[in-house]
Amino acid sequence: MSQYQAVKGTKDVFPDEAVQWQLVEGVVRRLAGLYAFGEVRTPVFEYTELFQRGIGATTDIVGKEMFSFLPDPQGRSLTLRPEMTAGVMRAALQRNLLSQAPLHKLFYISDLFRKERPQAGRQRQFTQFGAELLGASSPAAVAEVLSFMMGVFDALGLKGLRLRINTLGDLEDRARYRDALRAYFLPFADELDESSKERLEKNPLRILDSKNPALKELIAAAPRLFDFVKAEGVAEFEEVLSLLRDRGVSYEVDHLLVRGLDYYCHTAFEVTSSELGAQDAIGGGGRYDGLARELGGGKDMPAVGFAVGMERLLIAMEKQGLLEGLKPVGPKVFVVVQQLELSGHAMQVAFQLRRAGISTELDLAGRSMKAQMREANRLGAAYALFIGQTEFESGQYGLKNLVSSEQSTLTLDSITETLREPLLCG
């Protein structure tokens, strides 16, 4: 064993597990194509103030969880991105996207970093996929983003998910609600945990996010944000719900739902799974019209998005048996060489097969034929192609189907034509 180990809260992924990630990533990319979302990639680190302004200085992410490091030569602190939305909005403003087209639909599959206590489904380096729709935040835009997210879950076969949705109102609504919450919790200040006491002073909405079971009843009896939302905000929220019903998306209205990031406004949502225990959130999102202004864009930009944690999603899939039998695809052909001196010719044969689009593996360690066949079976190769002196001289190679054990003798051109994957037309 090496004296060097992976850093706590990080994980190595090898091919037998990577195939699970590839399954999810493939579904995300396919659904993104169906919904006409294009991929966006942003730097893995940004200036720290981007997240302080964008996410909110009173949030746990900014206050406790960011990996910030030595300033750049200009003396500005840098931070490994803890979430994607602020970086995507920064990129959109920098590129001045909305001057090029009124609407942009973007998706990502990206690694993120937070100083969390490592546990099942929560790592310090983790992966999220998500989407950002910039230029519109109408009920139709919200329904579009939600349909994309729930469509991914449906395509993966996940069952028992719970979509909770709420309206957070606008800035004025939330300001009045914060005052009401502070007045409600203040008489119970001695009963609050230290984290909630801090939140009571800075942003009492964050108390509603508490996972402390001792506060459950107190939080449940708190005033509802919904009661502070203006009539037009309520009507807009009802239209979102109507569109979700039209699309067959099941949901629960949860008036205590708030998101852990300060940029959300109006519609917010969260998806949970009973497979994950107390920390049951798989993903969530909502509208964030004011983020562009907060980041120096000069005015609000209509926007709505979501993010889903890949590690947590995979845990839920595993518990539902959706990953059983999933393994890396083996090579189509394993070239078995009988004499070591024919290894050069075996490499030429493998090269020609690969150039024809046929996945091919061969022995690179000078092993016996028996050992080579064991390796072909271990890898799950579909065929073994045998090269001995006779095959080398005649140009006729033995090809064995490793499933049916059927064997034939063919030229390399014939083998190529037999095994080549049919091209897609149209």
UniProtKB/Swiss-Prot annotation:
Gene3D superfamilies for the chain: Anticodon-binding domain, Bira Bifunctional Protein, Domain 2
Record keywords: Aminoacyl-tRNA synthetase, ATP-binding, Cytoplasm, Ligase, Nucleotide-binding, Protein biosynthesis
Family of the protein in this entry: Belongs to the class-II aminoacyl-tRNA synthetase family.
MF-aspect GO terms: ATP binding; histidine-tRNA ligase activity
Domain of life of the source: Bacteria
The protein's name in its UniProt record: Histidine--tRNA ligase
Primary location group: cytoplasm
Coiled-coil region list: none
Compartments it resides in: Cytoplasm
Gene for this chain: hisS
Subunit structure: Homodimer.
GO cellular component terms listed in the entry, alphabetical order: cytoplasm
Catalyzed reactions per annotation: tRNA(His) + L-histidine + ATP = L-histidyl-tRNA(His) + AMP + diphosphate + H(+)
Catalytic activity, EC: 6.1.1.21
Any GO BP annotation: histidyl-tRNA aminoacylation
